[in-house]
């Protein structure tokens, strides 16, 4: 089976065929660094991570570019309100973003492109649009893209430009479909911008949000590239405007495949600070939640469907991941025997790849994983898995986790003291004598000292770091 993805441009499932053999250019819309990213943002970033990982799993060589929007209406407003220089203000949120994606085990992009470092490319793109008659200077001295000059405007978001009011212009970065009009590609300086401006051939001002991504994506991936992703809220106006200005400038198709993930709800509703349902990743970690469990919740859904994020779902994910980790420890401790798990491993890989090839069907992929764990546990219970088979099981898990990113294969080595070993021995005596009260008491005492006991079906007990 080959990978099929849902192309938002045309709204249909298509076979993924890159432009250049096994090379894939991937542009992912990154954060606007005016605040800490919220959990809804990370739903998109985690899904994009799954996409990249599975492309690499499938043998593609991916070049991922992610933008960091460090100059726009929001960042300027935030810097002004905090009486900080724009670069100082945005730098702290860039830093926190990188810390957050590391906590969620999201692979770093090959290049993070900051808008403020690419002003010359943006100026050149605007100049090209003006030379070709697609952009004009307004009476406020800002430069606007004329959407009626671009016949295909609205094809991504489904907008009929023939019904638009002539002369309508929009200077702000974000707006609804009902307010569509010519959009700013270069914003003339005004007092609200304070010290944020560039003196260029276009005049004193700054780029519009949409021109930033067009200029940066084409610089690093070419005038036409394979994949552009983002949240569904980026579809309009941002991605629609990217297509218009890029294709108007080059005369070429901008992107072959567009992919968008749906919104994340919290407790069934849109996130709201007033309702106490607005979470940053840091908020959740401060509540004691495991980042990998948060990742599991974010990825374990069909990306084109809304997900309802509730704290209980993270607790359930923690239990699921803990079960996998216990399984890994159990398999790792098999040191003898001849049994293998060839059929179970083959079934896992076939089911996993079949699910992922169908528009990144993570829920069915994780279902295959847990069925595999159950089957192999049965083999172990019946002494039907040997050392070589166990090694193959671990290799299969590592292969699957190269996509999911939720497991930990780090072996923790530690030494117990003589006193702790004495407690372990006493606890084994109590367990064998079915003195469960004493057994549990000693188990809890050892756990308080950082040692967790795992009772194996063969009667042995494994001690590991708690």
Question: What are the language-model segments listed below?
Answer:
Residues 1-34, 45, 49, 120-332:
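Alpha-helical recognition segments enriched in aromatics with Gly/Pro capping
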Residues 10-15, 19-105, 454-458, 462-463:
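N-terminal, positively charged nucleic-acid-binding surface of large information/translation enzymes
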Residues 56, 102, 130-131, 259, ...:
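Alpha-helix C-terminal capping/helix-coil junction sites
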Residues 61-63, 133-139, 452-454:
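Short, well-structured beta-strand/strand-turn elements
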Residues 64-65, 110-113, 228-230:
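Short catalytic-loop micro-motif centered on adjacent basic/acidic residues
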Residues 82-88, 109-111, 306-308:
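Short, polar/flexible loop-turn hinges at active-site or ligand-entry regions and domain interfaces
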Residues 99-133:
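N-terminal, positively charged, Ser/Thr/Ala/Gly-biased leader segments
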Residues 272, 278-466:
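Structural preference for alpha-helix termini/caps and helix-kink/transition segments
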């Amino acid at each position: 089976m080959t990978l099929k993805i849902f192309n938002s441009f045309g709204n249909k499932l298509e076979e993924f065929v890159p432009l250049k053999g096994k090379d894939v250019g991937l542009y992912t819309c990154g954060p606007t660094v005016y605040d800490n990213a919220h959990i809804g943002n990370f739903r998109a970033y985690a899904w994009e991570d799954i996409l990249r990982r599975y492309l690499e799993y499938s043998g593609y060589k991916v070049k991922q570019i992610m933008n960091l929007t460090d100059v726009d209406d929001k960042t300027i407003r935030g810097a002004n309100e905090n009486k900080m220089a724009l670069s100082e203000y945005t730098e702290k949120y860039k830093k926190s973003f990188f810390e957050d994606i590391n906590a969620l085990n999201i692979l770093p992009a090959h290049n993070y492109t900051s808008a403020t470092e690419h002003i010359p490319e943006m100026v050149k793109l605007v100049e090209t649009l003006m030379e070709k008659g697609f952009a004009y200077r307004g009476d406020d001295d800002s430069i606007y893209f004329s959407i009626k000059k671009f016949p295909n405007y609205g094809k991504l978001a489904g907008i009929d430009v023939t019904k638009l009011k002539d002369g309508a212009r929009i200077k702000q970065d974000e707006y609804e479909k009902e307010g569509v009009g010519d959009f700013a590609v270069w914003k003339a300086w005004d007092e609200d911008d304070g010290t944020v401006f560039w003196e260029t051939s276009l005049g004193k001002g700054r780029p519009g949000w949409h021109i930033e991504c067009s200029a940066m994506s084409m610089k690093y991936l070419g005038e036409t590239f394979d994949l552009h992703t983002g949240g569904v809220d980026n579809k309009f106006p941002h991605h629609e405007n990217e297509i218009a200005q890029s294709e108007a400038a080059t005369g070429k198709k901008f992107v072959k495949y567009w992919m968008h993930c749906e919104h994340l709800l919290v407790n069934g509703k849109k996130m709201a600070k007033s309702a106490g349902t607005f979470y940053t990743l840091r908020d959740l970690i401060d509540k004691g939640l495991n980042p990998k469990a948060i990742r599991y919740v974010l990825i374990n859904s069909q990306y084109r469907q809304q997900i309802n994020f509730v704290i209980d779902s993270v607790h359930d994910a923690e239990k699921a991941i803990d079960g996998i980790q216990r399984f890994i420890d159990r398999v790792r401790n098999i040191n003898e025997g001849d049994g293998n798990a060839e059929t179970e491993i083959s079934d896992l890989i076939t089911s996993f790849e079949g699910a992922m090839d169908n528009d990144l069907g993570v829920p069915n992929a994780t279902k295959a994983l847990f069925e595999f764990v159950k089957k192999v546990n049965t083999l172990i219970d019946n002494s039907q898995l040997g050392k070589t088979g166990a090694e193959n099981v671990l290799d299969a898990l590592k292969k699957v986790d190269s996509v999911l990113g939720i497991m930990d294969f780090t072996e923790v080595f530690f030494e117990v003291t003589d006193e702790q070993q004495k407690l372990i021995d006493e606890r084994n005596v109590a367990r064998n004598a079915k003195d469960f009260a004493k057994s549990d008491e000693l188990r809890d005492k050892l756990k308080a000292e950082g040692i967790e006991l795992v009772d194996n079906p063969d009667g042995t007990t494994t001690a590991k770091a708690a």
